[in-house]
C-alpha cells in the first residue's frame, strides 16, 4: 500500500487522477476508481471493486470485494455494501441500435440510484436502476431489488419483498401476522418504529 495524503492505495489499484478520495480511506488491490468519482473519508473499497465515472460515495462506507458501482449511483454515509453486490443503471440494455449501429453515450439514458445513510446490502444482491434504498434499510443476501426500499425496511428474495424492519444496530425485526413490528429492539432497546423521523 502507498500513502498519499492519508489515503491508502494498493499498488495494483487503478485510481484516476480526476477521482477525489477522502482522508483515511483505503483502496485495496485491483480496485478501479474512474474519473470524477468521489469517495468520502474513512471508507474501505475492497479488492476488485469497480467505481464508475461520477459515482458518489459518502463517509465511513464499507464496500466489500467484487462490488460494481456504475454511473448514476450515489451512496450516503455509513452504508455497508456486501461482497459481489451489483448496481445496474440501464433500464433498456442493448449493445446496438435497431439499425445495427453500436450504441453511444447519446443513445443511453442513465437511471439514478440512491442508497441512503446507514443502509446495508447483503452479499450478491442486485439493485435495479432508479431505486432508492432508505436510511437504515437492510437488503438480504442474494436479493434482487426491483422497487424502492423504505427507511428501516428489511427485504429479501427475488424479487425482494418486505420481511420486517431493521434496527440501526443491525437487528432484524420481523413482522408478525402481516403487521409491522412495534416494540423494543431485543438487541439495543430502541423503540420501533422510531419516534423521530429520519
Per-region residue spans from a language model:
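Basic/polar N-terminal segments that are highly enriched at the extreme N-terminus
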Residues: 1-4, 196-198
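Flexible, glycine/small-residue-enriched loop-and-beta-strand segment within the central core
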Residues: 2-11, 16-19, 26-132, 164, ...
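Internal alpha/beta core interface subdomains
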Residues: 135-138, 144
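Loop-to-transmembrane alpha-helix entry segments
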Residues: 147-148
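Short, intrinsically disordered, charge-biased short linear motifs at domain edges
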Residues: 151-158, 166-178
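Cys/His-enriched microdomains
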Residues: 162-165, 183
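Short cysteine-rich clusters marking metal-coordination/redox-active sites
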Residues: 167, 185-188
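Short, non-ligating residues that shape and space the ligands of small metal-coordination modules
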Residues: 175-176, 193-197
Amino acid at each position: 500500500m502507498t500513502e498519499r495524503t492519508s489515503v491508502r492505495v494498493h499498488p495494483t489499484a487503478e485510481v484516476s487522477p480526476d477521482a477525489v478520495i477522502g482522508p483515511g480511506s483505503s483502496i485495496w488491490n485491483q480496485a478501479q476508481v474512474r474519473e470524477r468519482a468521489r469517495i468520502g473519508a474513512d471508507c474501505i473499497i475492497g479488492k476488485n471493486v469497480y467505481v464508475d465515472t461520477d459515482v458518489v460515495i459518502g463517509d465511513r462506507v464499507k464496500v466489500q470485494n467484487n462490488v460494481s458501482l456504475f454511473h448514476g449511483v450515489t451512496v450516503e454515509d455509513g452504508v455497508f455494501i456486501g461482497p459481489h453486490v451489483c448496481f445496474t443503471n440501464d433500464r433498456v440494455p442493448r449493445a446496438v441500435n435497431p439499425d445495427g449501429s453500436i450504441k453511444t453515450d447519446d443513445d443511453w439514458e442513465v437511471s439514478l440510484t440512491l442508497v441512503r445513510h446507514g443502509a446495508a446490502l447483503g452479499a450478491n444482491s442486485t439493485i435495479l436502476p432508479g431505486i432508492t434504498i432508505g436510511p437504515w434499510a437492510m437488503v438480504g443476501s442474494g436479493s434482487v431489488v426491483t422497487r424502492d426500499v423504505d427507511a428501516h425496511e428489511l427485504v429479501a428474495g427475488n424479487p425482494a419483498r418486505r420481511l420486517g424492519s431493521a434496527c440501526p444496530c443491525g437487528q432484524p425485526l420481523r413482522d408478525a401476522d402481516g403487521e409491522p413490528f412495534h416494540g423494543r429492539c431485543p438487541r439495543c432497546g430502541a423503540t420501533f418504529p422510531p419516534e423521530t423521523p429520519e
